Swiss-Prot record:
NCBIfam families: adh_III_F_hyde (TIGR02818). It comes from Photobacterium damsela subsp. piscicida. InterPro entries: ADH-like_C (IPR013149), ADH-like_N (IPR013154), ADH_3 (IPR014183), ADH_Zn_CS (IPR002328), GroES-like_sf (IPR011032), NAD(P)-bd_dom_sf (IPR036291), PKS_ER (IPR020843). GO terms for biological process: formaldehyde catabolic process. The gene is frmA. GO terms for cellular component: cytosol. It is found in: Cytoplasm. This is S-(hydroxymethyl)glutathione dehydrogenase. Homodimer.
Length: 369
């Protein structure tokens, strides 16, 4: 099958819109026609060359929504015509991780997914006869993609695909981090470092949890209006102070903030977020992905005196069983998605979407096919 796709032929190069060949789905696989895909910082991170798992040439994209076209042998959970969201965090329901009840980090396809291939260790994408790598098990920058059955969430066909595609990554990650990882309670204080799509989703999740003070922190004050719309009570630009932002937050709260979230991927900000956490019980959740080889540091005393450092992937959400419910929440208005979509454009303009993101002019650009 022929498909239009935005292909990354090398690190740091603009994506090229080309026609590729997509092979049929094999056993346990599904062919999906993508209708919409968000452009996420993780795509830009891999494209930059900083991602230690980055492989080229590759079809990027992992925040999409579409419709099942064809299923491979043995596929029973979806059928042609079903509306789906591809998952970069699979859920097989059978591995040690899935059955533990402790994590969403399924390992069913992790090894091959990290190598940019399907579970049988081969690709379904080709250009001029040469294979292309898959990306995060999704590759939503192709109009047609092949995904493992365990990496697909079946959703309500009435859902707005332009909006719910964002539940494939950023919004789910942020909201899930609040409810699943941090378990924010009513009245707790929350500080969010970085007000991109994930950070704003954390703010929204904190409001859902009925948090008390919600501190929104960013060096780009143009993000503050939307943060307030989502529920932030205090907006802080670290550049406005002549002292570290963690000192500012501790002084504003007496002992620190109950829950802090790092949504950037900057190891220095990760330290600031931890050191802003409340003495005795504060916890800091790392969501942002740092560059290859980066390490985090703090004084052990910060942990000895009761602070906890945590991390989360996909907000602790189990995609196949829990994401459909989040789609329903979006349809009912419990999760607000429309404000995240600041730009929409066709695939041909996808490089403009990356420019908008790098310039801090967008929250999410959604590509439609």
């Amino acid at each position: 099958m022929k498909s239009r796709a935005a292909v990354a032929f090398g690190p740091g190069l603009p994506l090229e819109i080309v026609e590729i060949d997509v092979a049929p789905p094999k056993k346990g696989e599904v062919l999906v026609k993508i209708s919409h895909t968000g452009v996420c910082h993780t795509d830009a991170y891999t494209l930059s060359g900083d991602d230690p798992e980055g492989l080229f040439p590759v079809v990027l994209g992992h925040e999409g929504a579409g419709v099942v076209v064809e299923v491979g042998e043995g596929v029973t959970s979806v059928k042609p015509g079903d509306h789906v969201i591809p998952l970069y965090t699979a859920e097989c329901g059978e591995c040690d991780f899935c059955t533990s009840g402790k994590t969403n980090l399924c390992v069913a396809v992790r090894e091959t997914q990290g190598k940019g291939v399907m579970p049988d260790a081969t690709s379904r994408f080709f250009v001029n006869g040469q294979p292309l790598y898959h990306y995060m098990g999704c590759s939503t920058f192709s109009e047609y993609t092949v995904v493992a059955e365990v990496s697909l969430a079946k959703i309500n066909p009435q859902a707005n695909a332009e909006q719910v595609c964002l539940l494939g990554c950023g919004v789910t990650t942020g909201i899930g981090a609040v409810h699943n990882t941090a378990k924010v309670q009513e009245g707790d204080s929350v500080a969010v470092f970085g007000l991109g799509g994930i950070g704003l989703a954390v703010v929204q999740g904190a409001r859902q949890a009925k948090a008390g003070r919600i501190f929104a922190i960013d060096t780009n004050p143009s993000k503050f209006e939307l943060a307030k719309q989502f529920g932030a009570t205090d907006c802080i630009n670290p550049n406005d102070y002549d002292k570290p932002v963690q000192q500012v937050l501790v002084e504003m709260t007496k002992w620190g903030v109950d829950h802090t979230f790092e949504c950037i991927g900057n190891v220095n900000v990760m330290r600031s977020a931890l050191e802003s956490a409340h003495r005795g019980w504060g916890q800091s959740v790392i969501i942002g992905v740092a560059g290859a080889g980066k390490e985090i540091s703090t004084r052990p005393f910060q942990l000895v005196t009761g602070r906890v450092w945590k991390g989360t992937a996909f907000g602790g959400v189990k995609g196949r069983t829990q994401l459909p419910g989040m789609v329903e929440d979006a349809m009912s208005g419990k999760i607000e998605l429309a404000p995240f979509v600041t730009h929409t454009m066709e695939l041909d303009k996808i490089n403009e979407a990356f420019d908008l993101m790098h310039d801090g002019k967008s929250i999410r650009t959604v590509i439609h096919y």
